[in-house]
Swiss-Prot record:
Protein family according to the UniProt entry: Belongs to the peroxidase family. Cytochrome c peroxidase subfamily.
Identification of the protein by name: Cytochrome c peroxidase, mitochondrial
Organism: Saccharomyces cerevisiae (strain ATCC 204508 / S288c) (Baker's yeast)
GO biological process: cellular response to oxidative stress; hydrogen peroxide catabolic process; response to reactive oxygen species
Signal peptide start-end: none
Catalytic residues as annotated in Swiss-Prot or TrEMBL: 119, 258
Residue numbers of Phosphotyrosine PTMs: 220
Length: 361
């Protein structure tokens, strides 16, 4: 019995004639024979909770044979789809962001869409290429109900009418495109985005526990991001997205905003880290967080960036140069969304979407 959530029925559909390939990296490195498996799929019309294995009847056999080999996730674009098709999806998300602006006390859905894209990508493990944005596995209960994903259900529900309007887009493409749209529409940098993620079956869902803990120090932060193949600069840049939204006690065990402009993408996160008068306090959940007299907060992992000399120098750089932050964030976020995906040589170049303002909409 499948345990996919039912909130977004059409997200369970797989792309037509897409393939998953499994290769032995060790054998390839040794110039020995490689193991490859390709399984054609047919589009499933059942809901994610409807008992379908999405046309992957033989995938488990292939995976069993290659259980010790890293996966290779090959991007495959839905036939006939072009930049214009994905710009239409972008526009639908952006217009809904504009219209549904009352969410979270008028912060809006932008921050939760960025977090959804981040978390569905942040499960990736470079050692075996499992997890990540490719398979869209957040639609299954194990990932959907991961305690670290509390609150993301709101972003998932937000995307439901978008997917009903564009049923051909894969789950992974929709989740990641939602984050790109949100960043750009909140006046952030352009994020190059590539399509071709493929819905994979439930048994490819990564285990819980792959997302970062908030109560740790800089050594933990550096070690965690090594699994995502991120260097120090990329780490600090990605954490700058905490300028968006706020924490909620019921979801994360922490409470409060990181700054004042919580639905505008800026470098305020770094400015506040350096300039606010921070005090370590326990909140109503008995968790320690850094609070300022301005009413802002920082997670222990946030504050650790100014306790580590290497991170601190980058924090100062971004606080003084928002353009540099935007440039580095764009590259790091693009990398995060694409981790673990192999794009064929004939795949489309990354798309750069126009904002609603640029289109006069």
């Amino acid at each position: 019995m499948t345990t996919a959530v039912r909130l977004l029925p059409s997200l369970g559909r797989t792309a037509h004639k897409r393939s998953l390939y499994l290769f032995s990296a060790a054998a390839a490195a040794a110039a020995a024979a490689t193991f490859a498996y390709s399984q054609s799929q047919k589009r499933s019309s059942s809901s994610p909770g409807g008992g379908s294995n999405h046309g992957w009847n033989n995938w488990g056999k292939a995976a069993a044979l290659a259980s010790t080999t890293p996966l290779v996730h090959v991007a495959s674009v839905e036939k006939g789809r072009s930049y214009e098709d994905f710009q239409k999806v972008y526009n639908a998300i952006a217009l809904k962001l504009r219209e549904d602006d009352e969410y979270d006390n008028y912060i809006g859905y932008g921050p939760v869409l960025v977090r959804l894209a981040w978390h569905t990508s942040g499960t990736w493990d470079k050692h075996d290429n499992t997890g990540g944005s490719y398979g869209g596995t957040y639609r299954f209960k194990k990932e959907f109900n991961d305690p670290s994903n509390a609150g993301l259900q709101n972003g998932f529900k937000f995307l439901e009418p978008i997917h009903k309007e564009f049923p051909w887009i894969s789950s992974g493409d929709l989740f990641s495109l939602g984050g790109v749209t949100a960043v750009q529409e909140m006046q952030g940098p352009k994020i190059p985005w590539r399509c071709g993620r493929v819905d994979t079956p439930e048994d490819t869902t990564p285990d819980n526990g792959r997302l970062p803990d908030a109560d740790k120090d800089a050594d933990y932060v550096r070690t965690f991001f090594q699994r995502l193949n991120m260097n120090d600069r990329e780490v600090v840049a990605l954490m700058g997205a905490h300028a968006l939204g706020k924490t909620h006690l019921k979801n994360s065990g922490y409470e409060g905003p990181w700054g004042a402009a919580n639905n505008v993408f800026t470098n305020e996160f770094y400015l506040n880290l350096l300039n606010e008068d921070w005090k370590l306090e326990k909140n109503d959940a008995n968790n320690e967080q850094w609070d300022s007299k301005s009413g802002y907060m920082m997670l222990p992992t946030d504050y650790s960036l100014i306790q580590d000399p290497k991170y601190l120098s980058i924090v100062k750089e971004y606080a003084n140069d928002q353009d540099k932050f935007f440039k580095d964030f764009s590259k790091a976020f693009e990398k995060l969304l694409e981790n673990g995906i192999t794009f064929p040589k004939d795949a489309p170049s990354p798309f750069i979407f126009k904002t609603l303002e640029e289109q006069g909409l």
